[in-house]
A protein has these predicted regions:
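Active-site loop-to-helix "anion-binding N-cap" substructures in soluble metabolic enzymes
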Residues: 1-260
Length: 260
């Protein structure tokens, strides 16, 4: 199965950027630059306070809306957390879980990533599950072993049907926010190994339905080459998603591959 037959997705991650007042201009310019062909899903994962405004403003350009994290708890005395039910009420369709910054800065564990994945699925929100190796792990030839462990932990207890409603984002930690990017061959090698791991956890048919995104400093200059790889079905975009023109170029490259 190739890119055209799997869901192609470009998911921007605004991180701790943008304000509500900036959203109308962003979505208007994005709409003007988006390709006419609607062969891929385009999503912005925004900070919590921006989700509702982005959902409203994005309706005209068919822009999907996502969150950047979710509580592993459904309700209760958990000050400062946001539940999957609340995200659903805001209109969130996707949610990032296990981002390297959450794992590094907030000590998020594989068990928490698994719990968040399950609670999102229970609320009909698509989890974008982030996995990836550090520079030290790559240098010690541990990339595939470590990433396979992360995938297995995230999907623990999920049925094949549930797994098919998940998205994986491969983000090499050494390429996040550094301007460094894995070569297309390096990215494809790891994404292919992720699909092989899914095949072992479930079966080949299930593995072939799950979209795998590349999330390590993809930009307008390298998107074409990365998206041409057989096991890369889109991108989870950081800094480039803050600029409408750059983001639109990445979307256009994805749509072109998906429509062929």
């Amino acid at each position: 199965m190739n890119l055209k037959e799997r869901k192609a997705i470009i998911a921007g991650n605004w991180k701790l950027n943008k304000r509500v007042a900036e959203i109308p201009a962003f979505t208007q310019e994005l709409q003007a630059n988006l390709p006419a062909a609607r062969c891929c899903d385009v999503v912005i994962c925004a900070p919590y306070p921006l989700i509702a405004a982005l959902e409203t403003a994005g309706q005209g350009c068919h822009l999907g809306v996502g969150a950047q994290d979710v509580s592993e708890h459904q309700h209760g005395a958990f000050t400062g957390e946001v539940s999957a039910e609340q995200l659903s009420d805001l209109g969130a369709q996707y949610c990032i879980v296990g981002h390297s910054e959450r794992r590094s800065y907030h000590g998020e564990t594989d068990l928490q990533v698994n719990a968040k994945t399950k609670i999102l699925l229970d609320n009909s929100i698509t989890p974008i599950i982030c996995v990836g190796e550090s520079l030290a792990q790559r240098e010690h030839d541990l990339t595939e072993t470590y990433v396979a462990y992360q995938v297995a932990a995230a999907f623990s207890g999920l049925t094949a049907e549930q797994a098919m409603h998940c998205v994986i984002a491969y983000e090499p930690l050494w390429a996040i926010g550094t301007g460094n990017t894995a070569t297309s061959a390096q990215a494809q090698e790891v994404c292919a190994s992720i699909r092989a791991t899914l095949g072992k956890l479930y079966d080949l048919e299930t593995a072939q339905t799950i979209s795998i995104l590349y999330g390590g400093s993809m930009n307008a200059g390298n998107a074409d080459e990365l998206l041409a790889q057989p096991d890369i079905d889109g991108g989870r975009i950081g800094g480039a998603s803050l600029k409408q023109v750059d983001f639109s170029k990445i979307v256009a490259a994805t749509a072109q591959g998906a429509c062929e």
